[in-house]
Amino acid sequence: MLNYTGLENKNVLVVGLAKSGYEAAKLLSKLGANVTVNDGKDLSQDAHVKDLESMGISVVSGSHPLTLLDNNPIIVKNPGIPYTVSIIDEAVKRGLKILTEVELSYLISEAPIIAVTGTNGKTTVTSLIGDMFKKSRLTGRLSGNIGYVASKVAQEVKPTDYLVTELSSFQLLGIEKYKPHIAIITNIYSAHLDYHENLENYQNAKKQIYKNQTEEDYLICNYHQRQVIESEELKAKTLYFSTQQEVDGIYIKDGFIIYKGVRIINTEDLVLPGEHNLENILAAVLACILAGVPIKAIIDSLTTFSGIEHRLQYVGTNRTNKYYNDSKATNTLATQFALNSFNQPIIWLCGGLDRGNEFDELIPYMENVRAMVVFGQTKAKFAKLGNSQGKSVIEANNVEDAVDKVQDIIEPNDVVLLSPACASWDQYSTFEERGEKFIERFRAHLPSY
């Protein structure tokens, strides 16, 4: 870890606890800052609070007193806290310095960074890059939105390691100096409009990933979205991926993945399922080539890596029916990919947090949907969608109830697909929890012998 002294003896307010706020507070204390943590929830019974207080960190919970800003000129904001929250809104008005936990990870580490963002595919790309590093003798440590707090991992890496960091639009907002050596934008579509208010704001948040890059760095992006992704701020060397044509970067031609005219692998030898994953694979391969991962390790990974939990995850078979957990599909594009992945009749479990989206764009992908079981805040919207297409629609209270109701309508060879097209926060704390509940309920219905 770098001996960063820029925060020594400074008063710093961490807004929002959770995992990233907890680790950020501990790191700030280690860097010599005077730390206060604030969370709108009552944390009086939280074990983490006692741990922080034992380190001399003050914790104020249950509300956001604006007086906390009087003596704390530096704010570290948890990515899940919107800028519209009163204390952050007031900090902006006062012109206070607002950092992110991801920014801290950059300030304390000399390790080069591969940063991955995008509306869809970023977790798959990040995981695949990590697997390719694992198959080599190089070290690539996963961090960020994938579940490993960036500022914690950054304290553990060597300067010769790579930090492989998944970044959400929330984490990219507010970065100042953060500079990945290799940045990947998988794609940009409409998402998180409840947080960003409009599509332009969301797109601009994603573009933050390359704002500090120089000519010595790389941006990897989808060739067919280059007009959306690129801007005047872009200084890095841009390389593209495409499944449709030859590009300056990496592409598929005659059934092979090709880089600089060299065939790397036949696409028939890939294990990761789904046409949409070809783009994810191309992005990961190109990043690893640039990072110096041997081609043999890349091929070893591509012929063994089968995917990640909660992303079109095969859960199991009950009689003749296969169940798939796609709980990470928190927007319509991800669900389009899921619905497009099966030729069998589908019982589609969908619904969740209402972000103001309409779902008519899913209609062209519903041909194989035989029935829908809908739940969550968007239950009525999905019921209306299903009825408009002549589908059988059943309403459920939640994911567990949805799996129960599936048993009443299921027919031989139906695929049962949880692909909510919505975030989980109306009923579950995370999409992982939602997916685990689906799996638990599936197992509860397995016959006992």
Curated annotation (Swiss-Prot):
Main location per the UniProt record? cytoplasm
Q: Does the keyword Disulfide bond apply?
A: no
Q: Give its E.C. classification number.
A: 6.3.2.9
Q: Which domain of life is it from?
A: Bacteria
A GO term for molecular function: UDP-N-acetylmuramoylalanine-D-glutamate ligase activity
One of the record's GO cellular component terms: cytoplasm
Q: In which residues is ATP bound? A: 118-124
Protein's pathway = Cell wall biogenesis; peptidoglycan biosynthesis
Q: Span of the secretion signal?
A: none
Keyword check for Transferase, yes or no.
no
Instruction: State a single Pfam family of this protein.
Output: MurD-like_N
Q: Which SUPFAM superfamilies match?
A: MurCD N-terminal domain, MurD-like peptide ligases, catalytic domain, MurD-like peptide ligases, peptide-binding domain
HAMAP family, per database record:
MurD (MF_00639)
Q: What role does it play? A: Cell wall formation. Catalyzes the addition of glutamate to the nucleotide precursor UDP-N-acetylmuramoyl-L-alanine (UMA).
Name of the molecule in the record: UDP-N-acetylmuramoylalanine--D-glutamate ligase
Native source species: Staphylococcus aureus (strain MW2)
